Curated annotation (Swiss-Prot):
Fe cation 1 binds at residues 60-61, 93-94. One of its GO terms (cellular component) is cytoplasm. Its EC number is 1.14.99.29. Belongs to the deoxyhypusine hydroxylase family. Fe cation 2 binds at residues 223-224, 256-257. Keywords: Cytoplasm, Hypusine biosynthesis, Iron, Metal-binding, Monooxygenase, Nucleus, Oxidoreductase, Repeat. It catalyses: [eIF5A protein]-deoxyhypusine + AH2 + O2 = [eIF5A protein]-hypusine + A + H2O. This is Deoxyhypusine hydroxylase. SUPFAM superfamilies: ARM repeat. Residues 147-170 are annotated as: Disordered. Gene3D superfamilies: Leucine-rich Repeat Variant.
Amino acid sequence: MATETLPELKKVLLNEDGQTALALRFRALFSLKDMGEKGDNGAIDVIAEGFKDDSELLKHELAYVLGQTKNFHAVKPLQGVLADTNQQAMVRHEAAEALGALGDKGSVAMLQEYFENDPLEVIRETCELALERIKWENSEAAKTETLQKSAYTSIDPAPPLPTDQAEGSDKATVEKLQKTLMDKSQSLFHRYRAMFRLRDIGTEDAVLALATGFDDSSALFRHEIAYVFGQMSDPASVPALIKVLGKTEEEGMVRHEAAEALGSIATDDVLPILKKFAEDKDQVVRESAIVALDMYEYENSNEVEYAH
């Protein structure tokens, strides 16, 4: 990472000259994230200033990043975004998820209110997950469960199921997890736990099991499947992701996540698909494809890390 100062990164992230490409703004954001993780509250404040932007994609990423910093200075701006009904649903959802990722017990009352009363399903479901995550994090189970050490550093909306509930990575375990993944009689949180256990198993069978999640009725659930595929970066998920991205009737939050996932997989067959959807009429899909193309170039270059 280049050693830009906070004012320089702020200038790029907030597009102060009006001419900064979105992909560069994303790179500045990831540099600011590193600073925020190390306790730099000024970096958190700069990220929070970005919520005034027009780009739904950028704002949702700002919220996601704030949730990953483990920095409680981010709580207040995230609460403000969740409460702001003028913000796009995808941005508000990401703010609620970020409050869950931070594990902020002080946000429980607010999350409960929006879980019970928000008119949008995606917000209600996200608040449900955030509440369950905070509850789990402060439970005995969090101390006693044996979780597989994950290859991923992200703070997820739910922890994976413990290994004693889904041991090994054989076909039978994957089939059992797939049934849990799609079992509507289970809580959303429990189904997410099955999702992240499948991610951590990481076999091709696990990828194919996860792909069945695209048939779920919840847009939030479908978008999380695409997000997980982006983390796994397994070429076996490409056909399912291309199919989702090509469904113009699908929710933008799902299609955009599919575009980003394809960018992180970065196989040769992905490039023409991303170029096509960089012209999509849905702004969040279009911008995601443009950022994904930048990620594709990075994945196929010798750059050390994706940051400004």
